[in-house]
Amino acid sequence: FRRVLFRSQAFLAEKIFEPLNMLETSFSVEPEFHDRVAEPFARDPDGGMQMKVIDVCSAATLASGGGGLVSTASDYARFLQCMLGRGQLDDVRLLGPRTVDFMTTDHLGEIPIAPTGSRNMLPPGHGFGLGFAVRRTAGANAEPGSAGSYFWGGLAGTAFFVDPALDMFGCLMIQAPNQRDYYRALFRHLVYAALTD
């Protein structure tokens, strides 16, 4: 198991993090950088419930490309710049442009996202690509954004969006209990409200 964990970490470092100069992204934080970790609340301030999150200061036991990475705002911004560049950042081509287009295209179509009466993970007017919620049309939703924009969130309230039509992205790095949907929506509204062009 440790061999698989190491290979996953090494693969991501070699193929993604190092080429994009994301040198502060990993599955755990080295001891000399523990003082830089933004610790989430120990208790949910809304209900007082004890919160349990991943201990990023200990060695990772699972290398999941879909969850568990630790990063900085500047490293995450480099990844989002690469996505906005359709797979290229500076002189580094990480993905082909058509691959990024395919990843950020709705693949659900009319497939129901959630059973009737249950909480839907996607807002109205959105579908899902390969790892991203994708906006199908403008309107149909209170969230601002262009058709073709895509987003997702991480543990403890982190969130990002990429809006290719407006040539921009946003990244919200917070550490709080639960998903903090209100703050994610507020962040996006404030970013779009600040646009002057």
What are these regions (language model features)?
Residues 46, 165-166:
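Residue-level recognition of short loop/turn positions
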Residues 133-134, 161-163:
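Short, well-ordered beta-strand micro-motif
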Residues 173-197:
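Generic C-terminus detector
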Residues 154-156:
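Short, small/polar residue-rich loop motifs at catalytic or cofactor-binding pockets
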